[in-house]
């Protein structure tokens, strides 16, 4: 990028790679050039000189990549700009000033990615919002306030993600819930209370995923169960080898 000597060089470079703006000599950087850069890659906003940052440039940047909101000056972060950013990328919620975070904005974010719940202020984590979040990402259960964790919410979460069972309070890990979890993914056996790990339960988990064998109590690892687990893992590896992708 050391060969950027003229306006033409700069324009050609940033049309290919917006973040190449970082290599453009300061005397060649104009608002027009910055607009081209952020239109190609919103994150190029990081390299726009402070004196050239305008509301228009910021809007173009966040529409291209919501996480460009990180580089928007605080005084230019408007409700409209933040909504555009979050619409483009839910994780942009992490760069929204606390005073601009609304229930509507949070709902837009978690409908895209459940884990965006981690950026929602706790006082805005309502039962409805938490349910939407875990429907999209069961592991978002980790971000649900303790007082809002219900059996229904846990059931939705474990149906969506094997990892969700790790976030379920021990007192809510019922045989029924754990059964649903291992049916979704046998490796969820890792977070099943030992008291519930019966021979039948472990067999069901290993049949679902041979890798679950790792979390079967030693005293229940019979030769028959190990064989089933190994055969299941072998079958999966064969399927993977035959996949065209």
Segments and roles (model prediction):
Residues 1-245:
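Non-catalytic tandem-repeat scaffold regions and their flanking low-complexity/translocation tails
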């Amino acid at each position: 990028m050391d060969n950027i000597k003229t306006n033409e060089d700069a324009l050609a470079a940033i049309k290919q790679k917006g973040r190449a703006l970082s290599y453009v000599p300061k005397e060649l950087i104009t608002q027009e050039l910055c607009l081209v850069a952020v239109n190609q890659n919103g994150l190029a906003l990081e390299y726009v000189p402070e004196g050239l940052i305008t509301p228009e440039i910021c809007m173009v940047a966040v529409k291209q990549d919501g996480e460009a909101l990180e580089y928007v000056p605080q005084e230019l972060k408007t409700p409209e700009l933040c909504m555009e950013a979050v619409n483009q990328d839910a994780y942009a919620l992490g760069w929204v000033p606390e005073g601009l975070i609304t229930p509507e904005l949070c709902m837009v974010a978690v409908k895209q990615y459940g884990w965006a719940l981690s950026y929602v202020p706790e006082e805005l984590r309502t039962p409805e919002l938490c349910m939407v979040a875990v429907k999209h990402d069961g592991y978002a259960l980790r971000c649900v306030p303790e007082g809002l964790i219900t059996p229904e919410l846990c059931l939705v979460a474990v149906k969506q993600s094997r990892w969700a069972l790790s976030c379920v309070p021990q007192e809510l890990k019922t045989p029924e819930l754990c059964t649903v979890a291992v049916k979704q993914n046998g490796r969820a056996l890792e977070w099943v209370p030992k008291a519930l790990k019966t021979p039948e339960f472990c067999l069901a988990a290993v049949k679902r995923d041979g890798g679950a064998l790792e979390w079967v109590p030693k005293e229940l690892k019979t030769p028959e169960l190990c064989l089933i687990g190994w055969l299941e893992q072998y079958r999966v590896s064969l399927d993977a080898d035959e996949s065209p992708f």
